[in-house]
Amino acid sequence: MAQFTLWLLRHGHTVRLAATQFEMDPVFIKDLQERIHAISPRDNLDRLIAEPVASFEEVIRQLSKASIVVTSRFHGVIFSFLLGKPVLAVSYHPKIRDLAKEMGQDSFSLDINRLEADALIEKFQQLEYTKGDVSKHIRQQVDRYRHKLEEQYAAVLQL
C-alpha cells in the first residue's frame, strides 16, 4: 500500500487516510505513514492527510472529500457508495466483493491476498478515467435500492 500511496502522491493526488474501524485502522494508518516516510521522506508528503476520525460524522466528512475511495473496510465501501463515490475495494472478505458486484463495480474489487501495487495503480487509473460514469451508475443503484427498501417497509407495515 505504501508504493501505491507514493504513486498517488507523485501523480498529484491528495491522499486522505481515514479510519472507518476505530481500533485497528489508526494502527494501520500510523504504520503506513512510517513506511512512506522511510521510503520517501520528502516526496509530496504535504498531500498525505491523516486527520483523526472518531465518529460516524467524521467518517462521512472524510469520505465526502474524496473523489475516489480506496478501502478494505466493508463500511467504507457502503458509506462511499451511499455518497455516490467510486470505490476501489480491497477485498479481505467475500462480502466486500459481493457488494461491489451487486453495485456493478466488481471490476474495481481486488483480492487482498493477491494485491500488488501495479494492479492497484491500473485499477485506479481505470476508475479515474471513468469516474463520472461510475458515480452516475452508483447513484442510480443507490436510488434503486432506496426505492426497494421503501417498498419493503410499506409491505412490512401492512402486516
Spell out what each predicted region is.
Residues M1-L159:
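Active-site anion-handling motifs in enzyme catalytic cores
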